[in-house]
């Protein structure tokens, strides 16, 4: 192993790659612990890594600000080698790692990347709480970042890189490592199976609790299949983008379905038309409220407030009481972080 990408460099690579990095490959199984390189790979290699990995796309909202001339994050073992570098930021890891925590980037085994679960723990020590939730939701999503894809994303053919259960299992074995407390706390708020960053952001804005700036509508699942009858009485399966379960203090319950703008979430004109047909079937076939949310709507905080009012009015589930005097300020700040164009 010549180098090991970690922290934000690992996150950006994982989220920009269409293929999974296989921890169970025979090649990776041959590598013995300790896996982390002892020191940095050398100036020439560092320069090449910065040129190759330094321009990967990032997800809006994860970091409050993107540092100019971002360096590449590398994991090393020797604390005496962790001095300032022009092209890389060095992070020391002296503990013995399971082989599944470091994944080969290519078959030559020269470059490795930290696993999705390990990466989540690492960046939880660097991000604020909302950023950690967003990063975890991205790692548990069904998309990867792709400049050539519709809306800047494409769909993974092999499913998410990880899931909350796998992350929880990994964290349970990490003792008191740096980042473990916020990583565990944020895990309960992570949403899985999003098909775009904005789909996940919409779910979080609507359903995170008040203290985190959300509208606290209820629990949410993304892209969960539901069974219904169409207008002809035929049994069909449809997959709304968001399924939200609302509940008030008297335990009254209601379900709301939302679909996010197909022109930005999904790919191709035919796919968009299928999504529009799907929305019509959902409206006619399900005995619960259904809403379509456009990208234009999310550009206005007041429009989001209006959507929340409509959802509550359609279900009869009133908002829970709160004593927070700055609630709207918190909600506006979260909306701006997730959706305001910079």
Give the location of each predicted region:
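Surface segments flanking catalytic/ligand-binding clefts of nucleic-acid enzymes
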Residues: 157-342
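Short gly/ser-rich loop at a beta-strand->alpha-helix junction or flexible surface loop bordering the NTP-binding
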Residues: 1-178, 334-342
């Amino acid at each position: 192993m010549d180098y090991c990408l970690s922290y934000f460099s690992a996150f950006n690579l994982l989220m920009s790659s269409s293929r999974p990095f296989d921890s169970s490959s025979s090649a990776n199984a041959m590598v013995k612990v300790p896996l982390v390189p002892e020191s940095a790979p050398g100036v020439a290699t560092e320069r090449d890594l910065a040129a190759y990995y330094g321009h990967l796309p990032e997800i809006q909202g994860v970091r409050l600000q993107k540092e100019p001339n971002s360096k590449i994050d590398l994991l090393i073992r020797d604390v005496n080698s962790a001095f300032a570098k022009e092209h890389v930021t060095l992070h020391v890891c002296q503990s013995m790692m399971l082989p599944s925590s470091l994944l080969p980037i290519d078959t030559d085994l020269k470059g490795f990347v930290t696993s999705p679960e390990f990466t989540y723990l690492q960046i939880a020590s660097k991000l604020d709480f909302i950023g950690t939730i967003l990063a975890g939701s991205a790692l548990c999503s069904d998309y990867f970042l792709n400049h050539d894809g519709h809306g800047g994303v494409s769909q993974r053919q092999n499913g998410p890189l990880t899931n909350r259960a796998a992350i929880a299992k990994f964290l349970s074995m990490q003792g008191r490592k740096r980042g473990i407390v916020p990583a565990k706390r944020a895990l309960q708020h992570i949403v899985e199976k999003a098909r775009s960053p904005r789909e996940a952001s919409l779910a979080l804005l609507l359903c995170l609790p008040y203290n985190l700036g959300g509208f606290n509508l209820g629990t949410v699942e993304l892209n969960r299949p539901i069974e219904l009858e169409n207008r002809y009485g035929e049994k069909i399966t449809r997959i709304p983008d968001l399924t939200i379960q609302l509940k008030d203090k008297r335990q009254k319950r209601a379900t709301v379905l939302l679909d996010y703008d197909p022109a930005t979430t999904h790919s191709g004109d035919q796919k968009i038309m299928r999504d529009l047909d799907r929305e019509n079937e959902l409206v006619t076939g399900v005995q619960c409220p259904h809403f379509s949310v456009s990208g234009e709507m999310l550009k206005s905080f007041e429009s989001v407030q209006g959507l929340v009012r409509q959802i509550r009015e359609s279900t009869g589930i009133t908002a829970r009481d709160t004593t927070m005097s700055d609630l709207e300020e918190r909600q506006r700040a979260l909306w701006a972080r997730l959706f305001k164009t910079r």
